[in-house]
A protein has these predicted regions:
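Short beta-strand/loop segment that forms part of the nucleotide-sugar
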Residues: 11, 30-39, 56, 84
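Conserved donor nucleotide-binding strand/loop of the catalytic core
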Residues: 45-73
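A conserved acidic beta->alpha catalytic loop
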Residues: 26, 37-47, 83
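Short, well-ordered alpha-helix to beta-strand connector turns
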Residues: 30-31, 52, 74-76, 154
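Short acidic donor-binding/metal-coordinating loop in glycosyltransferase active sites
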Residues: 38, 58, 76, 83-86, ...
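Acidic helix N-cap motif at the loop->helix transition within catalytic regions
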Residues: 18-21, 42-51, 91-92
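Catalytic-site signature of metal-activated, phosphate-bearing donor transferases
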Residues: 65-71, 77-78, 89-254
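N-proximal low-complexity "stem/linker" segments adjacent to membrane-targeting elements
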Residues: 1-26
Length: 254
């Protein structure tokens, strides 16, 4: 039998002790685990060491640059990039092992299933949330985006069976606080890139998003959690464009 490609799992962390252990337990099949930490003050580092991870300290660079830095710390060319609140299912683990036996391409994506209000969403924006996370670092890399980062692959991308579970286990207040930070970063990045918002985008973007994810992708089948998840996503669109308009007005006044 052909020996499979060696695999490094890489994570970025900051005070992730509450979620980290299930993640590390799910990737015990990897040849190496690398945790790049940006200054945790909780038990994150102790948990990582307990599971045999190699810990690297790096001040925060932004989501894309931080994840690419983590990829660069891996000992192996094939990397699986995860967040601390994610878990690899047995089905996905088997699919990854099979793919690495004889890789057909340099990058693989798979579905992520998001848990919201204690329920794994099966429709709408919550599933399938396609993520490209397994790749040969010579054939793909993380974008330089400070937020909404994504992997840029040079060639074909294949799809694996099995789900990645996203267990954020947050309160609504914490979730909204995170979304507020993300929309601020997204607005600043779009503005810096020369993009401009308008009243039409401010009004239409949330409506289009609601129709797409709640109606067309049947988010309504996820009950009240699906409705709340969709509405918050729509408000994120509204918030991003509102913040861009604020930046535009500041530019005009200056």
């Amino acid at each position: 039998m052909t020996q499979r490609e060696s695999l490094s799992v890489v994570l970025i962390t900051l005070n992730a002790a509450a979620q980290l252990e299930p993640c590390l337990q799910s990737v015990g099949f990897a040849d190496e685990i690398v945790v790049v930490d940006s200054g945790s003050s909780d038990a994150t580092l102790e948990l990582a060491a307990r599971h045999g991870a190699r810990v690297v300290q790096q001040d925060w660079l932004g989501f894309g640059p931080q994840k690419q830095f983590a990829v660069g710390q891996a000992a192996n060319d094939w990397v699986l990039c995860l967040d601390a609140d994610e878990r690899v299912t047995p089905e996905l683990r088997a699919a990854i092992a099979s793919a690495l036996q004889a890789p057909a391409c340099g990058a693989y994506r798979f579905a992520r299933r998001n848990r919201f209000l204690g329920r794994y969403l099966r429709h709408g924006e919550g599933y399938p949330d396609w993520n490209l996370r397994l790749f040969d670092r010579h054939q793909a890399r993380w974008s330089d985006d400070m937020v909404h980062e994504h992997v840029l692959a040079q060639g074909a991308v294949a799809t694996l069976d099995g789900d990645l579970l996203h267990d954020s286990a947050e309160t609504i207040a914490a979730y909204l606080g995170k979304q507020n930070r993300y929309t601020s970063l997204a607005a600043e990045a779009a503005f810096a890139a020369g993009k401009r918002a308008s009243g039409a985008k401010l009004l239409l973007s949330p409506l289009v998003r609601f129709v797409k994810f709640y109606a067309l992708r049947r988010g309504f089948l996820d009950g009240l959690p699906g409705f709340i998840h969709t509405v918050i996503g729509c408000f994120n669109s509204f918030s991003k464009y509102a913040k861009m308009i604020e930046l535009q007005r500041k530019e005009t006044r200056s």
